[in-house]
């Protein structure tokens, strides 16, 4: 953690989470919550097969998000944190927990986790993410800088596809996260049912 605290962009990040960052809440019964927390402890490994098996035991869809947000700061393996942030992307527009996980990911020590976290914030299209993204525009590594640039561009123009195609391919790239994101998809008006 010492290296991270010395980075200038980490120091410039806001120290408090937005007011909407209430403690994660879950509708699951107490015994089920305990089981999910134990599964997430096993999830914290570099072994992809073990993570995949643990992932199958988590509740599908939105009910898992409060637990991912709760476990994220204590998760040691970069691979596990990347998986957590990746899964939250699908719910960035409909879940406060997914958005908050994106904000937490922006402070991560791994550039790959920060890249995925910028993707959550870009897909959410929420302007209150901009104060968390702007310091990353001056990050030392190119991956974080480009991800933050794409996310800021996507939010400013309210077009999540600009996150991936914010340079030479502007207007030619579509980032399809859920059904309805692709203008050429026949069922473009319906959202995917991930719950």
Regions of interest found by a model, annotated:
Residues 53-54, 84, 117, 148:
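Conserved hydrophobic register position within alpha-solenoid helical repeats
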């Amino acid at each position: 953690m010492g290296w991270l605290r010395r980075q200038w962009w980490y120091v410039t990040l806001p120290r408090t989470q937005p007011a909407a960052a209430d403690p994660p809440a879950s509708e699951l019964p107490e015994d089920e919550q305990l089981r999910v927390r134990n599964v997430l402890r096993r999830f914290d490994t570099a072994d992809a097969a073990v993570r995949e098996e643990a992932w199958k035991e988590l509740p599908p869809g939105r009910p898992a998000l409060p637990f991912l947000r709760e476990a994220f700061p204590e998760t040691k393996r970069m691979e596990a944190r990347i998986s957590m942030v990746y899964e939250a992307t699908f719910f960035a527009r409909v879940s406060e927990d997914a958005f908050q996980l994106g904000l937490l990911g922006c402070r991560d020590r791994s550039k790959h986790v920060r890249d995925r976290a910028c993707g959550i914030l870009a897909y959410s299209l929420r302007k209150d993410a901009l104060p968390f993204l702007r310091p990353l525009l001056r990050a030392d590594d190119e991956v974080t800088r480009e991800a933050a640039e794409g996310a800021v561009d996507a939010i400013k123009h309210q077009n999540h596809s600009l996150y991936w195609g914010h340079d030479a391919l502007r207007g030619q790239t579509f980032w399809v996260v859920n059904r309805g994101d692709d203008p050429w998809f026949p069922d473009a008006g319906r959202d995917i049912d991930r719950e």
